[in-house]
Amino acid sequence: MELKNDTQISKFILLGISEDPLWQPFLFGLFLFMYLVTLLGNLLIIIATITDSHLHTPMYFFLSNLSFADICFTSASIPKMLVNIQTKNKVITYEGCISQVFFFILFGVLDNFLLAVMAYDRYVAICHPLHYMVIMNCRLCGFLVLGSWVTTALNSLLQSSMALRLSFCTDLKIPHFVCELNQLVLLACNDTFPNDMVMYFAAILLGGGPLAGILYSYSKIVSSIRAISSSQGKYKAFSTCASHLSVVSLFYSTLLGVYLSSSFTQNSHSTARASVMYSVVTPMLNPFIYSLRNKDLMGALRRLLRRKS
C-alpha cells in the first residue's frame, strides 16, 4: 500500500543539534551567548562605520553590509532554536519553515557574494592603488552591493518557491536546528528532480562563481605583492587583506566541513552540528577578525564607546 502524500501539512518538527534533554540547558546558554556576541560585535561595526568619517571608504562600506548580513543570517535560525529549547516545543509551522528556507538561503548566499566583492576591493587597492578611489567610486560600490542583494534575493525566492511544490508523507522530523532546503527535499514524497537541479545549478553559479572571483583576485594580489621589492612594503600590502583572507578561509573551510560531514557520516545530527560553524560561529568571529589588527576600526570603536560613556 502506497503512502498518500499529505500536501496540507501545517507543521514540521525541528530535532535540533541534540535530542538529549540533559544537553538542552547547556545548548540554550551557549547559543544565547554566541547570538548576543554576534549581535553586539556586528552592530558595533555598523554603527562605527556610519558615524566615523574616517571609515567612509569602500572597504568599510562593504564590511558594514557583511556585518548586517551576518546579523540577519544568524537571526534567521537562532532565535527560533532558543525558543524551541526554552519551551521544549520543537514544532515550526509550515509557513515559518518556508520563511526560514528563504532567509537562510538569502543571507547565506549574500555572505558569499559580499566576500567576493570585498576580494575585488582588495584587488583594486593593492594592484591599482593610484586609481583606487576612481575605480571604487560610490556608484560602483552601490551597484556591487545592490547587485548582490538582487541576485541572492531572486535565487532565494526561486528556491523557496520550488519548495512549495514538495509533498510530504508521514515523517516530518527535520534533523536540524533550522529548516534547511536540502533536508526538506530529503523528506519529500514526490519527484524532487526539479528541486535537485535548481539547487545544483545554484551551487555552481552562486557558490562557485564568487569563489572563482575570490581566487582570481587573490592570485593577482599575490603576484603584485611578490613584485614589491621591500619586505616592509610586502608586509604592509599583505596586512590590508589579511583579515578578509582569514574570514574567507574560515567561511569556506566550514562549508567544506558541512559537505564532508553530510557525505561520510550516518549520524542524522552531524550536518546540523557542522552547520553551526558557518551559520553561527563564523558570523560571531568576523567582527573580531576584522577589528583586532585594524587600527582604524579599533580607533573608531574606541571613539564610539567614549561618546556613549
From Swiss-Prot:
It is found in: Cell membrane. Keywords: Cell membrane, Disulfide bond, G-protein coupled receptor, Glycoprotein, Membrane, Olfaction, Receptor, Sensory transduction, Transducer, Transmembrane, Transmembrane helix. It is a multi-pass membrane protein. One of its GO terms (cellular component) is membrane. One of its GO terms (biological process) is sensory perception of smell. Disulfide bonds join C97-C179. GO terms for molecular function: G protein-coupled receptor activity; olfactory receptor activity. The chain crosses the membrane at residues 27-47, 58-78, 98-118, 140-160, 197-217, 245-265, 270-292. Residues 1-26, 79-97, 161-196, 266-269 are extracellular. PANTHER family: OLFACTORY RECEPTOR. Belongs to the G-protein coupled receptor 1 family. Odorant receptor. This is Olfactory receptor 7A40. The lineage of its organism: Eukaryota, Metazoa, Chordata, Craniata, Vertebrata. The gene is Or7a40.
